[in-house]
Structures are given as C-alpha cells and as structure tokens.
C-alpha cells in the first residue's frame, strides 16, 4: 500500500482508502436495500418547469415502478439481451434503468442528439435486441430515424416508443426476475467522442454501484440530501453517480428534463436542493444567470464538478456565494466514471488546483507513456487506474480493449497529470492534446487556466497545429463573456505576464461556442479540423 503521507521524490503511486469495503451487489439489490432503509423517503422528483406538474415517488413506489418496468422488458426480451434507450431525461428513464437492472438486461445508453447514422452504429455495434425511443426530440423525428435504421440491423427485434411506455407498464403481468450477479454487465456506455468515433464501454453492476457509493462518501452525502441533476441520463454522471449515489444514501433525485440555468436555480430554491453535480460550463451559466443573488440558495452546500477542466477562477466565483463548497473529480466512462475526487473539507493547501486523491479501493499511478515506467512525483505522465469500477472492456473490440487495459488490469486513461507529495493529481490535459513546440512540451491546461482568469473570457481551448519551423504552434480559441470585448493583442500581453514566452499563443480565433460532447468536454479534434480546413 502507498501511504497518504508519501514524501516528495517517491514514485507517483497512490491508493485510495482500503478499509472501505467493496459491496458485492447488483443495482437491483441496491434498490431493494434503499427501500428497506427509507421506504417512505422521497426518492425521485420529475422536475417539470411548471411546479404544479411535478410528480414525486417514494423509494417504495420507485421499486414498484422499476419492477413493473422489469416485467415489461421481460415480456419482450431475455435476461442478457441488450436494449438501447434513446431518450432525453425523464422519470421513465430512471424506471427503465432500474427495471433493466432487475431484469438482468444490459442497457445501452444512447445520446438523443445522435444522427440517424450515429444511432445505427450504436445499435449495430452493441447488437441491441431492442430500442426504446423518445418520439420527437428538439424538433427531430426520432421514430423515423429508428424506422430508417431497422432494415440494416438484423439483431434489432423490437422498437418501443416512450409514449407507449406507461401503458405497457400498467398492463405488465408479474414475471419471475432472474438472479443478477455483481459482475454482470449492467450498461454499455458509448464514450463521449473527444477523439473521434465512440466505443462501447461494458460497465458492471458492481462497478456502477460502488463508484457512485464511493463518490457519495467523498462528498459527504447523507440521507435527506436533495440532488438536483442537470446531467444527461445517458451519461455515467447522470445515471450512475447521481441516480445510484442518491439511491444508496437515502437522497432525493430531482430530475429536470434538460439543463436550464434559470430552472436549476428555481429548483435549488423551491426543492431546497443541497447537491449539484455538473460540468464547469453548467455552473458558469448558473452563476451568470440574472437574479441569482435574489434567490434563496441557503440549502445549496455542494457543487461537484467534473467532465472538463475546472478553472480556479470558477471555484472562487462559486464559493463567493456563501456556504457553497466546490468539489472536483476526475474520471472517464471506462471507470464508471470517477477515479479521484476532492472532499468538502479537503486539507490540501491548493486543493482547487487538483482533482483530488483516489477514491476508496482505487489505485492510481502516473507513468511515462513511452516506457510504461512510473514517474517520480511532480513529473507529468499518463494517469492509470485500477479498481473494481473499471470496465470489463470495449464491446466487441478486443484491440481497443488491449490498448486501454493492460495485462495487470490497469486502465490507461490517455489523460496527463502530475501527482504531488500528498497523492493528489493535477491534470495537464489529454495525452493526444500535448503540444511539442521546438522540442518543448506544452500542456494546454496551463494556458487555458491563465486565459480563463481574464475578466472578458468565458471559455477557452488551446490546440497545437503543424508548423514547418517549430513542429507545432499554439492556437487559442476564445469565447467572450456577454457584453465584454478584448483583442488578441491584449490577450497575448496578458499571457506574457504569467507564462513563459514559448507558451504564449500567437494564433487566435474568437468563437461564439465550442463543439462539445454531451458531457461538456470540448472536442479539440473538431477545432483542429476547423482551423486546418479539413472535414
């Protein structure tokens, strides 16, 4: 084991707490355990923007709906089948997630924003036997997209519209539920695509349930907490960390149909929200919302952030609200998702510059990506993690699995960081995003943090592009705050006061928005293609 008091100069190896047990449990068992402990507790709120239309379920009622959903699924599919869910956030999403878990059916989570071609890839690659879909999403006819895809999908036996779901559940006949093991595949989650085509990560019941439990413990979640969830349910943060975190700690899961900053603030006030997990861009929009100071947000005690770099300036702004504490985590879909996290009472003197220490029962090391050797503390390298929460592998992709998971079970994340003397990680960016200019390694995160501290800057992404003389040069894409203006010359001079000359971008582009994944990560490959004029 590697102690929390490791001194500088030691290898970049750190274990999370090993005295915390791994629960050998399937998601359905976690649901039943919650009902045993808090049967009348409020478990779920369907947070319609119109307060009078909000619907609430206790833990006992949640189990009842989940069981009926399981019966509905088993009337059409067998345990072990893969069934896709192509839908925005709604209460039925939660019922189907838990129902599939009880039925031993693997849920394939699908982003409702996918094109017809992208949908066909996910359904085909996952070998989905069925798809449950939202009929119309943001003006797009998803029913037609499913119909168009079906002829090329021989494994797809059934397609169910969500507007039929409640009636099907109401008519469901009791069925025997199978024994589901902790190491069964609960979900196939397709990676967010920051580097290109997504792959299907196979996530187990044990991994999803324990990662959510470890996260909830790290942030100090307690029974009665009210979790306001802006994250998409097809993402591990939404259906894993929040859904299963609140479930296992006796919290209330408040689920709006989509992220809207004004609605989030209204829900925090009216539902007496205590916890919000979001990506940084969501919190920025909430803090920028007019009238935030007039809201009673006195119960909001935790804003937990992940999925994208967290600028220190954002932490300062958020905590200036009053009692609110910010926590920061790091992970990826392949690890269910969190690997490290800070805590509300973190003793680290500069915790806001880190993503914390490993979660319980999680080992982390930082390696030289070329040699595989563990680097000394303070040296940048690739983050690797090993835990019960790491994926089984990529579905039907042994080559990609072998690249991501080594023979000793370490997940190679592709993310760069250094580990300090306390075992905390400081993220430097993606391995593929590292820029080499004239032989010097440059990490975009450092430059982005400096630019984000400029009062006119709302968002920034720095990439490297080919250059004959230097090998690569820096290009900075900048999004300005509403009502603010600045120039590339001014920003360049601003950088020169805080960065070495070779780290200062020479090329600039002002943008209205960034291409992003559904989890809020900037797709730098798309920015690079845009700059180079390639499709």
Which ranges hold each PLM region?
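N-lobe entry segment of adenylate-forming
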Residues: 1-57, 61-76, 150, 155, ...
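AMP-binding/adenylate-forming catalytic core of the ANL superfamily
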Residues: 114-121, 131-133, 276, 387, ...
């Amino acid at each position: 084991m590697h102690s929390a008091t490791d001194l500088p100069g030691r290898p970049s190896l750190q274990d999370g707490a090993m005295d915390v047990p791994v629960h050998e449990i399937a998601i359905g068992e976690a649901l039943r355990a919650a009902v045993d402990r808090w049967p009348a507790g409020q478990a779920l709120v369907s947070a319609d923007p119109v307060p009078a239309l909000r619907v609430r379920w206790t833990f006992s009622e949640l189990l009842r709906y989940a069981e009926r959903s399981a019966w509905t699924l088993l009337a059409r599919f067998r345990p072990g089948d893969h069934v896709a869910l192509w839908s925005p956030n709604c209460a039925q999403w939660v019922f189907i997630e838990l129902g599939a878990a009880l039925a031993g059916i693997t849920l394939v989570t699908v982003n409702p924003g996918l094109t017809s071609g992208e949908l066909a890839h996910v359904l085909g690659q996952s070998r989905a036997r069925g798809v449950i879909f939202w009929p119309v999403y943001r003006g797009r006819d998803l029913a037609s997209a499913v119909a168009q895809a079906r002829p090329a999908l021989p494994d797809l036996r059934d397609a169910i519209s969500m507007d039929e779901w409640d009636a099907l559940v109401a008519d469901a006949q009791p069925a025997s539920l199978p024994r589901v093991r902790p190491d069964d595949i609960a979900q196939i989650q397709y990676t967010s695509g920051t580097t290109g085509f997504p792959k299907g990560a196979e996530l187990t019941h044990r991994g999803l349930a324990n990662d959510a439990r470890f996260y909830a413990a790290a942030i100090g979640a307690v029974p009665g907490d009210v979790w306001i969830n802006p994250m998409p349910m097809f993402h591990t943060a939404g259906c894993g960390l929040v859904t299963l975190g609140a479930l296992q700690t006796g919290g209330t899961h408040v689920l709006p149909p989509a992220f809207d900053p004004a609605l989030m603030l209204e829900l925090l006030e009216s539902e007496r929200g205590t916890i919000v997990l979001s990506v940084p861009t969501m919190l920025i929009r909430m803090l920028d919302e007019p009238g935030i100071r007039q809201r009673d947000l006195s119960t909001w005690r935790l804003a937990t952030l992940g999925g994208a770099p967290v600028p220190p300036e954002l932490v300062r702004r958020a905590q200036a609200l009053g009692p609110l504490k910010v926590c920061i985590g790091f992970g990826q879909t392949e690890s269910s998702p969190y690997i490290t996290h800070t805590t509300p009472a973190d003793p680290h003197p500069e915790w806001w510059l880190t993503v914390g220490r490993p979660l319980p029962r999680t080992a982390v090391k930082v390696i030289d990506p070329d040699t595989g050797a563990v680097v000394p503390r303070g040296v940048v390298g690739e983050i690797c993690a090993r835990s019960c929460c790491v994926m089984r592998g990529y579905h039907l992709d042994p080559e990609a699995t072998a690249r991501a998971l080594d023979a000793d079970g370490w997940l190679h994340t592709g993310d760069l960081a250094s580990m300090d003397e306390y075992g905390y990680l400081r993220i430097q960016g993606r391995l593929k995003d590292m820029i080499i200019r004239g032989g010097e390694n440059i990490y975009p995160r450092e430059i982005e943090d400096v630019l984000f501290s400029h009062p006119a800057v709302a968002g920034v992404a720095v990439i490297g592009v080919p250059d004959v003389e230097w090998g690569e040069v820096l290009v900075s894409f900048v999004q300005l705050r509403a009502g603010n203006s600045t120039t590339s010359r001014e920003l360049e001079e601003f950088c020169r006061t805080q960065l070495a000359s070779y780290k200062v971008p020479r090329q600039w582009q002002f943008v209205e928005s960034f291409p992003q994944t559904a989890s809020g990560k900037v797709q730098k490959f798309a920015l690079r293609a845009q700059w180079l004029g390639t499709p």
